[in-house]
């Protein structure tokens, strides 16, 4: 056995809040959000007239700066920025830039002290009433928001450039015969399909001329929408649903199941409930061990969280995270392949490494979420009408769908991890996080969008990953290519297999034991995923 570190999160719910306490907590969250949004807007205004002078090399991906005389310090250094705030543009070095626009210097512009005054239009204390420590932390939150927004904008711009490049390829294919190559016709195909000459080796089945024309129109609309969104002024309002606290601010009274946060709420007592009964002996031992681990952490902090509950009201939580060492297994008898789908929530199949075959435990998890979301769609259509009886009751029904989805995903993930632990197997899944969005078509029907929203890959896979790592079980992500089109028994490709429906897979290879037999498509895909992980082929990432 070898030890491995993993992050564990424990959430305590604050319960039995009076109306006064709720109002007090709610006001503090709103004040925190107001101050953060104010700070973000002022920082953006300050940095608006600064221009980055670095150029990135394509090969090394490193920033290159021209050397010159800094207009502030007068030394010959690398010039990183051009400051246009004080009339004439001034080219400045990294040290001078940090001295004027670094995080620490900008923070001083917002927070006044006994020895330092700030301008009235920059003073956070005039905007919101908060704890003194939070006044100093709010500029950090604002910088994080700006950084996240800029990263998202860069990603959107990159996607627009990629879409424009793809659109140009389709235009070339449509207008110039030399730029397109014909794919060999299949028996059932009426029209010839083409691919761009630069993509002859790609597995794409190609596009008909009408299909190419539709692609050009669809991608044009997509690019237009994206550019319109990029041209708008971006003002990001901070929701203020998470506040960072130092752990020593929180005082626990386990005998009464209460906490106090004197730095924020003076002597206000807040009743809590946790993942186990605080009053029981096992609960006391659990929390004693938990506090000991928390206090050993170098960065000792927690979060006060505000969430919207199923009835539309706010709920409050105290969340702690800490790193714990878990025993990682080195010896595995096989692999548990997990295929997450739409019609069925998931299929988990154990594949034995010695016998080279699928055997028990095998579990196909039904998807109750599909019915819940279909019912939700009907309710939304119903509520869109002008007059609906019992409107408030219907809205309450809508708000209760998310907790049911969360519970279903947690229950399924727990069962899958228990199966792997019992069978002494590691878990393998498809790596679909980036692939789903990239493969989306420019134009989707409402039905396609609806069924895509049924797919809970990210939510369920992250829960499986988290619960498995706590047990010391290895997670392997493999490429999703052809897992649902290849026969798990004989390895026949998509040309010798067929899918009569989404739930059924059929092999057409006469030598295969599944020849002309209808088998579960999710079972077949799960076995293929397990085989890829065991053979160490097309593995993307391995955790633990």
From Swiss-Prot:
Keyword RNA-binding in record: yes
Segments of this protein annotated with the region Wedge domain (WED): 196-326
Cofactor(s) recorded in Swiss-Prot or TrEMBL: Mg(2+); Zn(2+)
Chain residue ranges for the region called Recognition domain (REC): 1-195
EC number: 3.1.-.-
Coiled coil: none
Domain of life per record: Archaea
Cofactor note as given: Mg(2+) is required for dsDNA cleavage.
Active site per database record: 339, 430, 522
Keywords annotated in UniProt: DNA-binding, Endonuclease, Hydrolase, Metal-binding, Nuclease, RNA-binding, Zinc
Annotated stretches, region: Target nucleic acid-binding (TNB): 486-520
Residue segments, region RuvC-II: 521-541
Job of this protein: CRISPR (clustered regularly interspaced short palindromic repeat), is an adaptive immune system that provides protection against mobile genetic elements (viruses, transposable elements and conjugative plasmids). CRISPR clusters contain sequences complementary to antecedent mobile elements and target invading nucleic acids. CRISPR clusters are transcribed and processed into CRISPR RNA (crRNA), which requires a trans-encoded small RNA (tracrRNA), but not this protein (in vitro).
UniProt domain comment: Has an asymmetric bilobed structure, with a recognition (REC) lobe and nuclease (NUC) lobe; the sgRNA:target DNA is bound between the 2 lobes. The REC lobe (residues 1-312) is formed by the WED, ZF and REC domains, while the NUC lobe (residues 321-529) is formed by the RuvC and TNB domains. Has a split RuvC-like domain with the nuclease active sites.
Quaternary structure, from the entry: An asymmetric homodimer. Guide RNA is probably required for dimerization.
Similarity comment: family membership: Belongs to the CRISPR-associated endonuclease Cas12f family.
Additional detail: Part of a type V-F CRISPR-Cas system.
PANTHER family from the UniProt entry: RNA-GUIDED DNA ENDONUCLEASE RV2885C-RELATED (PTHR30405:SF11), TRANSPOSASE (PTHR30405)
Name listed for the protein in its UniProt record: CRISPR-associated endodeoxyribonuclease Cas12f2
Organism: Micrarchaeota archaeon (strain CG1_02_47_40)
Lineage, broadest ranks: Archaea, Candidatus Micrarchaeota
Gene that this polypeptide is encoded by: cas12f2
């Amino acid at each position: 056995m070898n030890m491995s570190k993993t992050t564990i999160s424990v959430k305590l719910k604050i319960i039995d809040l009076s109306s006064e306490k709720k109002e007090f907590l709610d006001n503090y969250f709103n004040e925190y959000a107001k101050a953060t949004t104010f700070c973000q807007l002022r920082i953006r205004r300050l940095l608006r007239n600064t221009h980055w002078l670095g150029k990135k090399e394509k090969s090394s991906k490193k920033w290159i700066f021209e050397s010159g005389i800094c207009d502030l310090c007068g030394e010959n250094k690398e010039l990183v920025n051009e400051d246009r705030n004080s009339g004439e543009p001034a080219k400045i070095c990294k040290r001078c830039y940090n001295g004027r626009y670094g995080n620490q210097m900008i923070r001083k512009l917002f927070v006044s002290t006994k020895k330092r005054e700030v301008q009235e239009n920059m003073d956070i204390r005039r905007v919101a009433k908060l704890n003194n420590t939070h006044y100093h932390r709010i500029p950090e939150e604002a910088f994080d928001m700006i950084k996240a927004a800029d990263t998202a904008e860069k990603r959107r711009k990159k996607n627009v450039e990629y879409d424009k490049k793809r659109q140009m390829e389709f235009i070339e294919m449509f207008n110039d015969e030399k730029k397109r190559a014909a794919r060999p016709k299949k028996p059932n195909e009426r029209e010839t399909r083409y691919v761009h000459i630069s993509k002859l080796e790609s597995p794409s089945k190609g596009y008909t001329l009408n299909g190419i024309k539709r692609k050009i129109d669809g991608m044009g609309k997509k690019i237009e929408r994206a550019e319109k969104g990029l041209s708008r002024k971006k003002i990001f309002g901070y929701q203020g649903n998470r506040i960072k606290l130092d752990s020593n601010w929180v005082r626990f009274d386990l005998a009464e199941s209460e906490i106090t946060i004197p730095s924020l709420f003076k002597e206000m007592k807040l009743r809590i409930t946790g993942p186990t009964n605080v009053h029981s002996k096992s609960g006391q031992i659990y929390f004693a061990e938990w506090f000991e681990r928390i206090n050993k952490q170098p960065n000792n902090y927690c979060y006060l969280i505000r969430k919207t509950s199923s009835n539309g009201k706010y709920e409050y939580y105290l969340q702690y995270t800490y790193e714990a060492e878990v025993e990682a297994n080195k010896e595995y008898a096989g692999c548990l392949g997990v295929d997450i789908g739409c019609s069925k929530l998931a299929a988990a199949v154990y594949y034995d490494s010695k016998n080279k075959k699928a055997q028990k435990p095998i579990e196909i998890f039904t998807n109750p979420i599909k019915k819940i979301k279909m019912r939700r769609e009907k309710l939304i259509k119903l509520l869109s009408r002008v007059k609906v009886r019992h409107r408030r009751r219907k809205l309450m029904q809508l708000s209760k769908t998310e907790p049911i989805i969360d519970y279903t995903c947690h229950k399924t993930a727990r069962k899958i991890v228990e199966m792997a632990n019992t069978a002494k197997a590691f878990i393998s899944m498809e790596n679909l996080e980036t692939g789903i969005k990239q493969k989306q078509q420019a134009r989707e029907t409402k039905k396609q969008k609806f069924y895509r929203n049924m797919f809970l890959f990210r939510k369920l896979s992250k829960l499986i990953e988290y619960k498995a790592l706590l047990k010391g079980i290895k997670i392997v992500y493999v490429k999703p290519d052809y897992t649902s089109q290849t026969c798990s028994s004989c390895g026949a490709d998509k040309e010798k297999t067929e899918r009569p429906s989404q739930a059924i897979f059929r092999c057409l290879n006469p030598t295969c034991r599944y020849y002309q037999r209808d088998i579960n498509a999710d079972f077949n895909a799960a076995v293929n995923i397990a085989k890829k992980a065991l053979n160490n082929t097309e593995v993307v990432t391995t955790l633990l």
